[in-house]
Amino acid sequence: VDFNVPIKEGKVKNTTRIQGAIPTLKKILEQNPKNVTLMSHMGRPDGKRVEKDSLKIVVPKLEELLGTKVNFVNDCVGSEALEASNAGNGQINLLENLRFHIQEEGKGLDANGAKIKADKESVKKFRKELSSLGDIYVNDAFGTAHRAHSSMVGIDHKIRVAGYLMKKELDYFAKALETPQRPFLVILGGAKVADKIQLIKSMLDKVDEMIIGGGMAFTFLKKYIMFPIGKSLFDEEGYKIVDEIIAKAKEKNVKIHLPTDFVCGTGLDASSPVALHDLKSGIPDGWLGLDAGQLTQRENADAIGRAKTIVWNGPQGAFEIEQFKNGSVSMLNALVKQTQNGATTIVGGGDTVNLVGANKANDKLSH
């Protein structure tokens, strides 16, 4: 399941993802299973235990929505998890955050913040332990289904099925992507080009226009026009494939939109000073682009206003911080307006879904 929900002041802020899993869970419980064990991510603890990312906080809301008790297990592997998986009477177990183990993603950070990788043998052992916790694998975590994580690709069961939420999401996306109303616009954000290379390539075969914003835009700007990006996010791996993406966009006659002005700060926190920079000035050393400026916001709104089908994956900036949220919020407002004008608007990706929920716009978009 995908219980990677936004938390504020020790409480679940938005229950959409938990609610989404309930139909599948209720259907499973109707079959009188010996027990049900739930796995999920929470936050980005980078392969180590971080208490603020514990899934324990989800239990009260899950119990309320299911109308039954949920047993929280303090680790996703080990003796406690194995013991819980052998319980009877239809017991529901929620395992602790999979991402507390480096073997889930295959990489993480050590205590000093240095990048580390999990060795193959430990990943193999981790996957075997997860597999031992059940007989049938149900994937209802659409938001993480694209990731090659152990819980997604490493569960060794003969019976592996999609849950109701997964099916609903896939059916909706298939219809929208196979027979879209045109013009068709895709909006991409997030940090790394390399993480979304397959998505970018496949969308270039389908769309008429593409907005590239957020952190990944700086990799494009540095490569494409040698723009000075200061200490903005830069994806070295993605840098190598920018030319290929731009060439394919030209071949397919897809118009690419990149930001033209930026709200910048010296750090990713609320105490950071704020400065405005554009393509002429560049971003100075020591500063990083953290949001789209007003000109970019207007250009994005114009592109959204032309589109009849819009897919949005990735915010335009560090929207969690007050002074860097306007680019993402203005984009959301433009999508809400275009939905009212009859466009089909689809939002995906954890951060973007959280942004929509935080601005109480879940029911103002198509999906």
UniProtKB/Swiss-Prot annotation:
Q: What class of enzyme is it?
A: transferase
Q: Which of UniProt's keywords are assigned here?
A: ATP-binding, Glycolysis, Kinase, Magnesium, Metal-binding, Nucleotide-binding, Transferase
One GO biological-process annotation of the entry reads: gluconeogenesis
Per UniProt, (2R)-3-phosphoglycerate binds at: V1, D2, F3, N4, R17, S40, H41, G43, R44, L98, R99, H146, R147
Residues noted as binding ATP in the record, renumbered to the chain: A191, K196, G215, G289, E320, D351, T352
Q: Which family does it belong to?
A: Belongs to the phosphoglycerate kinase family.
What InterPro entries does this protein map onto? Phosphoglycerate_kinase, Phosphoglycerate_kinase_N, Phosphoglycerate_kinase_sf
Instruction: Write out the residues that bind ADP.
Output: G190, G214, F319
Give the catalysed reaction(s), semicolon-separated: (2R)-3-phosphoglycerate + ATP = (2R)-3-phospho-glyceroyl phosphate + ADP
Record's PANTHER family? PHOSPHOGLYCERATE KINASE
What Pfam family is a match, any one?
A: PGK
Q: What is this protein called?
A: Phosphoglycerate kinase
Quaternary context: Monomer.
Listed binding positions for Mg(2+) are A191, A194, D195, D351
Q: Give Gene Ontology CC terms.
A: cytosol
Record: residues binding AMP: A191, K192, K196, G215, G289, E320
The reply on keyword DNA-binding is: no
Gene Ontology MF terms in the entry: ADP binding; ATP binding; metal ion binding; phosphoglycerate kinase activity
Query: What species is given as this protein's source?
Result: Paramecium primaurelia
